[in-house]
């Protein structure tokens, strides 16, 4: 849980101010990408009460592949996505996808294997107007789908280390609205989206969630990994909503998103003893 620190004296004041400035710079300035930041946030789905908060949870970053969840809602609501296995789209060379993603993909595979080109083909079929309208109506993050300055690529790249940003606090608020049927879409769209979000186990919790992996560039050309894991966990009749974010963590064998996922799954059973 977060702790409040009592500070007195000039040195403590200077240290506190410096810390705040450096944290803000990490959010808005790639030059400080080497610094580390993390957040683990858990709220009760029914009441919205805070259950656990640790780290800097109000700083906004690109959602990366966690944005596939709202994209799925849009796709089902717009009748572009029809069920868990329809449509199944073939890969095309012009998609410029990673080699591992150059395969026929349906909504279940899309979420499970985090297929970037499927997201982009979905937004192309939505079109700029409908895509932007959904983001605005969802009140998702900063709602900026303009993309990279001067590139006019928001339709296919806004969520990929570009203009669209969201904080862990905003992620859990959005997810709670989704789970409670408070988004301005059809009930079928909500239920079909829930059906394709991957399942994981964490002790006696059934967890559904989506990872996201990206990076911040620093002034020297270095990269600081960004890892997301967002979703909900159910045990008996209790459901909680969570967001886990890491920025600048040491690179390991796993990409940052799956690493954030495994960290959360490993710690949830112990965390939930205090829920």
Swiss-Prot record:
The modification N6-carboxylysine is found at residue 68. It comes from the Bacteria. It holds the Pfam family Transpeptidase. Its EC number is 3.5.2.6. The gene is bla. Inhibited by clavulanic acid, sulbactam, tazobactam, and imipenem. The keyword Cell wall biogenesis/degradation does not apply. It comes from Pseudomonas aeruginosa. This is Beta-lactamase OXA-18. SUPFAM superfamilies: beta-lactamase/transpeptidase-like. GO terms for molecular function: beta-lactamase activity; penicillin binding.
């Amino acid at each position: 849980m977060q702790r409040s620190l009592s500070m007195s004296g000039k040195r403590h004041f200077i240290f506190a101010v410096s810390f705040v400035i450096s944290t803000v710079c990490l959010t808005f300035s790639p030059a400080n990408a080497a610094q580390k930041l993390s957040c683990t946030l858990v709220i009760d789905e029914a009441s919205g009460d805070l259950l656990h908060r640790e780290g800097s949870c109000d700083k906004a970053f690109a959602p990366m592949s966690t944005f596939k969840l709202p994209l799925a809602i849009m796709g089902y609501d717009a009748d572009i996505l029809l069920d868990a296995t329809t449509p199944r789209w073939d890969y095309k060379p012009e998609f410029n996808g990673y080699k591992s993603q150059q395969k026929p993909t349906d909504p279940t595979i899309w979420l499970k294997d985090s297929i970037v080109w499927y997201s982009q083909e979905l937004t192309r079929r939505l079109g700029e107007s409908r895509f932007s309208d959904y983001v605005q109506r969802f009140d998702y993050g900063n709602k900026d789908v303009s993309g990279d300055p001067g590139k006019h690529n928001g339709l296919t790249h806004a969520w990929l280390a570009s203009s669209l940003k969201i904080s862990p606090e905003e992620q859990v608020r959005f997810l709670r609205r989704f789970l409670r049927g408070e988004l301005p879409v059809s009930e079928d769209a909500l239920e079909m989206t829930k059906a394709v979000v991957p399942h994981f186990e964490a002790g006696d919790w059934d967890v559904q969630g989506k990872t996201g992996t990206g990076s911040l560039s620093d002034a020297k050309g270095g990269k600081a990994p960004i890892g997301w894991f967002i979703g909900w966990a159910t045990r008996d009749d209790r459901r909680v909503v969570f967001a886990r974010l890491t920025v600048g963590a040491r690179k390991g064998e796993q990409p940052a998103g799956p690493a954030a996922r495994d960290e959360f799954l490993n710690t949830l059973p112990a965390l939930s003893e205090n829920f």
